[in-house]
């Protein structure tokens, strides 16, 4: 199964048309109540392939911003080739991690970044993530998968101490256990997922976004939206009714496979 690509949101994005499927993308990133936006969203295209990166930089004083941008730049370079096998994904993650470490050496800082990365090639999706930036997958409008956070609060969920919904405002929600540029930067890789008949939707978002938009609201607004731009903006409206004046940066990227 081939894809028809329609890219509205990525700056400089191209439109490539093949057969059978249409891919629409959109991304949004906002500094929220902070002075600096440490998040980065990037959408890459290579022929008929689409790759999406979302990262949440850690470190403050613009260091987090530099880290997430460095990781995105390294992954963009890696995306010039195929990104289908475990070895290719692991190497791409290693390149991104090295870029953050090189940044630390040059600046003397301790900046890090979380990451979620999605690769769509032909009829196959693969992804990897580090930290608490999430990927959600919806099939025909129903959530069928989400990544597991690498965080202290998610460990509390696994131990039965709190529920998944309580993770949103848990006292340890900002303590990530894995990050690029950190001691543990090992990505969690997915197995290849074949996109069978039906409509697939992918949402990648930082904690500043998913903390304020619940999964049932993601499904409801998805059902009411014709494009990824409509969907993300509908979810942002929900977010803006709930955030405080000093809320975190928030970033989301969506892919519609139709």
Give residue ranges: language-model regions.
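PP2C/PPM-type serine/threonine phosphatase catalytic domain
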Residues: 1-258
